[in-house]
Amino acid sequence: MSQSTAVFCLGVSAFPVAKKISAFLDAELHGKTGRVSQADVFFSDAMEHLSKLFQDGIPIVGVCASAVLIRGVAKSISDKKTEPALVAVAEDGSAVVPLLGGHHGANDLARKISELLGVDPAITTSGDIRFGISLDEPPEGFVLANPEDVKEFSVSMLAGESLMISSDENHSCLDYVLGNKTLGNGSKQIFYNWLKVSNLP
C-alpha cells in the first residue's frame, strides 16, 4: 500500500471496532465531527472525505454499510489498475468485505482484519477463490513482469487451461506456460513471464 490506511468511522456505534482496527493496523482513525469524540482526523462531509481519500490513493477501511463507501467513491472510480484498497466492515465486526482494489491490497487487508475480529473475509475475486492467490499480486520476493497480460492469463487459468512452470538455471525468473500460446518470435510456447524474482533489498 502506498500510504497509511484510513479507518473511516461515522458514529459512536462503530467506534469500538474502528478503534480496534486502527490500533491493529497502526492506521489513522477518521471520525465524523459531532458524532465521534476521538479520532486522528475529523471530517464533516462523509462523501466528500471518502472521495478525497480515494482520489489520493489512500486505502480505506470503512466501519459502516458498504453502500456508504460505494456512494462515496463512485465518482472517483476510473482505473482498476491504480485504485486503492476499499474494505467495508460491519459496525459490530461480523463481516469484512473487500469492495475495490482486491488485488491491490484489499483482499490481504480484509484477511488481516478478519483474523483480528475472528470472522471469515467475504472475498469474491475468482483467482483467490480457485487458487488461493491473487494472480496479479505475487508473493513476497517476486514482482509481476508483465501486468498487461494478467487478464488473459487469469481467464485462461479459470477456464481450465493446462499450465507448465519453467525457470532458468539461476531461478531468477519463473515462466508460466499456458497451452500453445506464444510470445515474441514464437520460439517458445511461453504465454508470458508471470513472475520474476525481485531485486529489491
Identify what each model region corresponds to:
Residues 1-60, 72-83, 89-201:
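SAM-dependent methyltransferases
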Residues 62-66:
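Short His-Asn-centered micro-motif
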